[in-house]
């Protein structure tokens, strides 16, 4: 992969969904399909929305290590980023990624206590394309 920033960014931007993996309270791996990140800063930081009451928030609070996977089904390539998450509940973070129509998920609006932001910070990753894997650091 010649340019990780460009390649990974393109895959992430075109994906309609991504997959968030983490370890649950019983020590087992869990993978959840999520709507694609609302925002990203390069290929280091990604912001996703979720319900504060979800099992994933409890698990990620206890163990912030996680993976974020994006796939390009057209060219059969993908990237798994590894890193840590932080659960953000402050008004500024919530307003930052709020979108029209989010009341479908968060009935009380942007201040809904059951709405929070997952901030994923990548430290490395693995890119797959052409039957080959390539690890990279961020």
Role assignments for model-derived ranges:
Residues 15-17, 44-46, 63-66, 113-115, ...:
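Short, surface-exposed beta-edge/turn micro-motifs
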Residues 2, 15-19, 99-102:
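Short Pro/Gly-enriched beta-strand edge/turn motifs at strand-loop
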Residues 37-75:
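A short mixed-secondary-structure module that forms the rim of ligand-binding clefts
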Residues 1-6, 50-56, 102-104:
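Charged, amphipathic alpha-helical segments
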């Amino acid at each position: 992969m010649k340019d990780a920033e460009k390649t990974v960014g393109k895959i992430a931007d075109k994906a309609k969904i991504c997959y968030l993996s983490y370890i649950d309270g019983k020590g087992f791996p869990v993978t959840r399909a999520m709507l694609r990140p609302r925002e990203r800063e390069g290929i280091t930081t990604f912001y996703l929305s979720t319900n504060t009451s979800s099992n994933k928030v409890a698990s990620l609070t206890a163990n912030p290590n996680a993976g974020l996977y994006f796939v390009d089904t057209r060219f059969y390539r993908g990237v798994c980023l590894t890193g840590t998450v932080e659960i953000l509940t402050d008004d500024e973070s919530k307003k930052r990624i709020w979108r029209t129509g989010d009341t479908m998920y968060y009935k009380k609006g942007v201040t809904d206590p059951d709405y929070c932001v997952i901030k994923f910070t990548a430290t490395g990753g693995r890119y797959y394309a052409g039957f080959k894997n390539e690890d990279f650091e961020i």
